[in-house]
């Protein structure tokens, strides 16, 4: 069973690039995407992921704030 990954980045282009890279490996599956820390926080509170790929500089809630 592939590991479920949450991809978080405010840039739509970077989200797409990261997802494309992750999807090339059958051991991983992009389960969800978020455009900022608040959206990611909501997803994390409702779902379980094996890993999170996280941008640091984002509006509303940045990556470091999300980690806290």
What are these language model-derived features?
Residues 8-9, 34, 52:
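Conserved sequence signature across two-component system core domains
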Residues 55:
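Active-site residues of response regulator receiver
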